[in-house]
């Protein structure tokens, strides 16, 4: 291989509005203590009515491109992961975001892998770069999850937040600056555990069709049990495959879904406090944006430096899951 895929830059953006747990007491039977005890979440950010996922994503994307010392014209491919796209079916949020960046005549498409979206993005970007098809790939996890939440459902609306994270994946000849390994998987037999139904309307040919509300639905207990079991196995597999141990990893950056899930994986693998990146307490579950946002916070705090090895993992609707070993190739 002449070169490897490399994570050259990372950036993030969140809306300005902070929503604390206590604010849900206005319309739900809940409390700050109840939410934090079960999830580890203290607050989250919600976008305003005018903001869309692409608006959040484009701010993060511009900074990621700048940090990679590139311009939008240098980007060969744009891929966005989101469960809250700007439009129902088309155009893709990636196309909308590309236009806002001034990128023309370059491929752009979305990935639908829910909370595992960023791991899927890494897999796609790695393949495009290492095949020689692209030199610079912009990947963006952008979510306005508040647009798909049922604020009468205590089991879901307290969990999620809005935000975006973006990375530029480029080339390197150094293995220890590369996206070392990515593994992704799915099992559609559990698709009814976590889903957003499509709104169906009657037609002149099928007047019996019933409309459904397009809000995120989740079987929380079932998802929790499967997530812990699956992630433990997946993380052990990628470490063993690459002849690595938890102590070889500089930072463990899991999807920020729920503190209890993160803690279960962390304790099983015996990660130390300084190895684990946590942001769920202040942003909630930002789905496909959570890993790049957490990665960016670590970078901006000085915890992530060039050549550091990160272990990423995620689990989401589909059901989908995945993990990655990534050396930071930025500066």
UniProtKB/Swiss-Prot annotation:
Region (ACP-binding): 256-260
Species the sequence originates in: Helicobacter pylori (strain Shi470)
Molecular function terms, GO-annotated: 3-oxoacyl-[acyl-carrier-protein] synthase activity; beta-ketoacyl-acyl-carrier-protein synthase III activity
Gene that this sequence comes from: fabH
Domain of life where this protein originates: Bacteria
GO cellular component: cytoplasm
Family: Belongs to the thiolase-like superfamily. FabH family.
Oligomeric form and interacting partners: Homodimer.
Main location: cytoplasm
Residues annotated as the enzyme's active site: 115, 255, 285
Uppermost EC category: transferase
CDD domains: KAS_III
UniProt feature coiled coil, ranges: none
EC number: 2.3.1.180
GO annotation, biological process: fatty acid biosynthetic process; secondary metabolite biosynthetic process
Role: Catalyzes the condensation reaction of fatty acid synthesis by the addition to an acyl acceptor of two carbons from malonyl-ACP. Catalyzes the first condensation reaction which initiates fatty acid synthesis and may therefore play a role in governing the total rate of fatty acid production. Possesses both acetoacetyl-ACP synthase and acetyl transacylase activities. Its substrate specificity determines the biosynthesis of branched-chain and/or straight-chain of fatty acids.
Domain notes: The last Arg residue of the ACP-binding site is essential for the weak association between ACP/AcpP and FabH.
Disulfide bonds: none
Record bears the keyword Endoplasmic reticulum: no
Protein's recorded name: Beta-ketoacyl-[acyl-carrier-protein] synthase III
Pathway(s) where this gene product acts: Lipid metabolism; fatty acid biosynthesis
Protein location: Cytoplasm
Pfam families with a match to the protein in the record: ACP_syn_III, ACP_syn_III_C
Catalytic activity as recorded in UniProt: malonyl-[ACP] + acetyl-CoA + H(+) = 3-oxobutanoyl-[ACP] + CO2 + CoA
